[in-house]
From Swiss-Prot:
Belongs to the FlgH family. This is Flagellar L-ring protein. Keywords: Bacterial flagellum, Cell outer membrane, Lipoprotein, Membrane, Palmitate, Signal. Assembles around the rod to form the L-ring and probably protects the motor/basal body from shearing forces during rotation. It is found in: Cell outer membrane; Bacterial flagellum basal body. A lipid is attached at residue 23 (N-palmitoyl cysteine). The gene is flgH. It comes from Stenotrophomonas maltophilia (strain R551-3). GO terms for biological process: bacterial-type flagellum-dependent cell motility. GO terms for cellular component: bacterial-type flagellum basal body, distal rod, L ring; cell outer membrane.
Length: 230
């Protein structure tokens, strides 16, 4: 067997491996952020105080509604997110260079050979570059996610965290919400809009055939990366 055929076999095997690798990578386009396993969060138990009428711990609310205020309470966040972004960039450069050397003379007479100037020279160069880019993006997210109060800050604000996993027939959907809310912004039905969540971290993603159909192939990603010289 000739060395050329061995090289062809090796190249074919590498190409097949690259194609299979590209198919596997395209399945999970965007990895999900890691979150700690969900565990019930309970407020600390108050230690009994001998000989005292009142004990430390959560108070008994007799005349107030059941809004989230303590560690372990549940709160529903209404996701109402609308974002629109648009950018445009244009770049154009042009440079021209001209160089000309006149015919030298000796004792007032030009240096010629056969009646033609042999020492005169000229050069000319030009460079042009044009670049253009446009980007437009619009996102809309609506829904409800119930989160858990994981910490109560000294100023009374609540740190909340929660996620929702949906397994559908065409893939998986995940919504993660983290942030800080102010108890005064919580409505009577124990809900709060996402626009009232400070330090908000809202993640929405999907896996499956639908998400895979919106992803570039490995060869398209290569030609759109900074590795290609074109």
């Amino acid at each position: 067997m000739s060395p050329l055929s061995n090289f062809a076999r090796t190249a074919l095997a590498c190409a097949v491996a690259a194609l299979l690798g590209g198919c596997v990578i395209a399945g999970d386009v965007r990895p999900y952020p890691t979150m700690a396993p969900i565990q019930p969060i309970m407020p600390p138990q108050a230690q009994p105080t001998a000989g005292a009428i009142y004990a430390a711990g959560p108070t008994l609310q007799l005349y107030s509604d059941r809004r989230a205020r303590d560690v372990g309470d549940l709160l529903t966040i209404s996701l109402l997110e609308n974002t629109t972004a648009q950018t445009s960039a244009n770049t154009a450069t042009n440079k021209e260079s001209n160089l000309s050397l006149g015919t030298p003379s000796i004792f007032g007479a030009p240096v010629t050979l056969g009646g033609k100037d042999i020492l005169s020279a000229s050069a000319k160069g030009a460079r042009d570059f044009t670049g253009k880019g446009n980007s437009a993006q619009s996102n809309r997210l609506q829904g409800n996610v119930t989160v858990t109060v994981i910490q109560r800050l000294p100023n009374g604000n609540l740190v909340v965290q929660g996620q929702k996993n949906l397994r559908l027939n065409q893939g998986d959907e995940l919504v993660q919400v983290q942030g800080i809310v102010r108890p005064g912004d919580i409505s009577q039905d124990n809900t709060i809009p996402s626009s009232r969540v400070a330090e908000a971290r809202i993640v929405y993603g999907g896996r499956g055939p639908v998400a895979q159909s919106n992803a570039m192939g490995w060869l398209s990603r290569f030609f759109n990366s900074g590795l290609t010289p074109f």
